[in-house]
Amino acid sequence: GAGPAQLRTLLRRISGVDAVLAEIGALGAEVRYRRVLGAVAELEALAVGGAALGERISGFLSRDDTVVARMAAALDMAGDMAGEVAGETAPGDPSGHLARAVRWQRYSRASGSDLHRACGADIARGSLRLWSQACATLPGERPVEREDPA
Protein backbone atom coordinates (compact mmCIF):
# COMPACT_ATOMS: atom_id res chain seq x y z
CA GLY A 1 0.00 0.00 0.00
CA ALA A 2 0.92 3.55 -0.68
CA GLY A 3 1.36 6.07 2.11
CA PRO A 4 -0.62 9.33 2.40
CA ALA A 5 2.10 11.39 0.68
CA GLN A 6 2.31 8.99 -2.26
CA LEU A 7 -1.47 8.94 -2.58
CA ARG A 8 -1.61 12.77 -2.59
CA THR A 9 1.08 12.88 -5.28
CA LEU A 10 -0.79 10.36 -7.41
CA LEU A 11 -4.09 12.24 -7.05
CA ARG A 12 -2.45 15.57 -7.96
CA ARG A 13 -0.89 14.03 -11.05
CA ILE A 14 -4.11 12.34 -12.19
CA SER A 15 -6.32 15.37 -11.53
CA GLY A 16 -4.07 17.86 -13.33
CA VAL A 17 -4.64 20.40 -10.54
CA ASP A 18 -1.01 21.58 -10.72
CA ALA A 19 -1.41 22.51 -14.39
CA VAL A 20 -4.63 24.39 -13.60
CA LEU A 21 -2.97 26.31 -10.75
CA ALA A 22 0.01 27.15 -12.97
CA GLU A 23 -2.32 28.46 -15.69
CA ILE A 24 -4.24 30.60 -13.20
CA GLY A 25 -0.97 32.03 -11.91
CA ALA A 26 0.22 32.78 -15.44
CA LEU A 27 -3.04 34.51 -16.36
CA GLY A 28 -2.85 36.67 -13.25
CA ALA A 29 0.79 37.62 -13.84
CA GLU A 30 -0.01 40.06 -16.64
CA VAL A 31 -2.75 41.71 -14.60
CA ARG A 32 -0.42 42.05 -11.61
CA TYR A 33 2.35 43.51 -13.77
CA ARG A 34 -0.04 46.01 -15.37
CA ARG A 35 -1.07 47.09 -11.86
CA VAL A 36 2.58 47.62 -10.92
CA LEU A 37 3.09 49.75 -14.03
CA GLY A 38 -0.04 51.74 -13.23
CA ALA A 39 1.03 52.38 -9.66
CA VAL A 40 4.50 53.45 -10.78
CA ALA A 41 2.99 55.85 -13.35
CA GLU A 42 0.79 57.40 -10.66
CA LEU A 43 3.75 57.80 -8.31
CA GLU A 44 5.83 59.37 -11.08
CA ALA A 45 3.02 61.86 -11.74
CA LEU A 46 2.88 62.74 -8.03
CA ALA A 47 6.66 63.17 -7.97
CA VAL A 48 6.45 65.95 -10.54
CA GLY A 49 4.15 68.01 -8.33
CA GLY A 50 6.01 68.71 -5.11
CA ALA A 51 9.69 69.27 -4.36
CA ALA A 52 10.04 67.42 -1.03
CA LEU A 53 7.40 64.81 -1.80
CA GLY A 54 8.74 64.43 -5.32
CA GLU A 55 12.23 63.71 -4.03
CA ARG A 56 10.92 61.09 -1.61
CA ILE A 57 8.87 59.40 -4.32
CA SER A 58 11.77 59.48 -6.79
CA GLY A 59 14.03 58.05 -4.11
CA PHE A 60 11.56 55.25 -3.43
CA LEU A 61 11.14 54.41 -7.12
CA SER A 62 14.90 54.26 -7.67
CA ARG A 63 15.72 52.15 -4.59
CA ASP A 64 17.25 48.75 -5.26
CA ASP A 65 14.37 46.98 -3.51
CA THR A 66 11.78 48.76 -5.66
CA VAL A 67 13.66 48.07 -8.91
CA VAL A 68 14.08 44.39 -7.99
CA ALA A 69 10.38 44.14 -7.04
CA ARG A 70 9.43 45.52 -10.46
CA MET A 71 11.75 42.95 -12.01
CA ALA A 72 10.07 40.15 -10.04
CA ALA A 73 6.63 41.21 -11.30
CA ALA A 74 8.00 41.39 -14.84
CA LEU A 75 9.61 37.95 -14.51
CA ASP A 76 6.26 36.51 -13.41
CA MET A 77 4.69 37.84 -16.58
CA ALA A 78 7.68 36.83 -18.70
CA GLY A 79 7.34 33.25 -17.52
CA ASP A 80 4.12 33.08 -19.51
CA MET A 81 5.34 34.86 -22.65
CA ALA A 82 8.91 33.58 -22.93
CA GLY A 83 8.93 30.15 -21.31
CA GLU A 84 10.40 29.28 -17.94
CA VAL A 85 12.71 32.06 -16.75
CA ALA A 86 13.34 31.06 -13.13
CA GLY A 87 16.42 29.04 -14.01
CA GLU A 88 18.02 31.74 -16.16
CA THR A 89 20.78 32.48 -13.67
CA ALA A 90 22.73 30.01 -11.63
CA PRO A 91 22.53 30.70 -7.89
CA GLY A 92 25.69 32.41 -6.68
CA ASP A 93 26.82 33.33 -10.21
CA PRO A 94 26.71 37.14 -10.55
CA SER A 95 27.62 36.98 -14.24
CA GLY A 96 24.25 35.34 -14.85
CA HIS A 97 22.56 38.61 -13.86
CA LEU A 98 24.56 40.46 -16.51
CA ALA A 99 23.72 37.90 -19.20
CA ARG A 100 20.03 38.10 -18.27
CA ALA A 101 20.16 41.91 -18.41
CA VAL A 102 21.62 41.83 -21.92
CA ARG A 103 19.13 39.24 -23.14
CA TRP A 104 16.09 41.11 -21.80
CA GLN A 105 17.35 44.51 -22.98
CA ARG A 106 17.52 43.06 -26.50
CA TYR A 107 14.06 41.61 -26.04
CA SER A 108 12.66 44.98 -24.93
CA ARG A 109 14.10 46.72 -27.97
CA ALA A 110 12.76 44.11 -30.40
CA SER A 111 9.28 43.80 -28.89
CA GLY A 112 6.31 45.28 -30.69
CA SER A 113 4.14 45.95 -27.64
CA ASP A 114 4.61 48.65 -25.01
CA LEU A 115 3.85 46.12 -22.28
CA HIS A 116 6.55 43.71 -23.43
CA ARG A 117 9.07 46.54 -23.89
CA ALA A 118 8.41 47.68 -20.32
CA CYS A 119 8.67 44.10 -19.07
CA GLY A 120 12.02 43.53 -20.77
CA ALA A 121 13.35 46.86 -19.53
CA ASP A 122 12.28 46.12 -15.93
CA ILE A 123 13.97 42.71 -16.04
CA ALA A 124 17.14 44.22 -17.51
CA ARG A 125 17.19 47.04 -14.94
CA GLY A 126 16.62 44.70 -12.00
CA SER A 127 19.23 42.25 -13.26
CA LEU A 128 21.79 45.04 -13.50
CA ARG A 129 20.99 46.08 -9.92
CA LEU A 130 21.49 42.51 -8.70
CA TRP A 131 24.72 42.25 -10.68
CA SER A 132 25.92 45.54 -9.20
CA GLN A 133 25.00 44.44 -5.66
CA ALA A 134 27.07 41.30 -6.14
CA CYS A 135 30.10 43.51 -6.96
CA ALA A 136 30.47 41.65 -10.21
CA THR A 137 32.93 42.50 -12.92
CA LEU A 138 32.71 42.19 -16.66
CA PRO A 139 33.79 38.83 -18.07
CA GLY A 140 37.60 38.70 -18.20
CA GLU A 141 38.11 41.56 -15.72
CA ARG A 142 39.63 41.25 -12.28
CA PRO A 143 37.39 42.13 -9.32
CA VAL A 144 37.90 45.60 -7.85
CA GLU A 145 39.29 45.54 -4.32
CA ARG A 146 36.98 47.44 -1.99
CA GLU A 147 38.25 49.24 1.07
CA ASP A 148 36.94 48.09 4.43
CA PRO A 149 34.87 50.99 5.86
CA ALA A 150 35.88 50.10 9.44
Annotate each PLM feature.
Residues 1-150:
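Non-catalytic alpha-helical scaffolds
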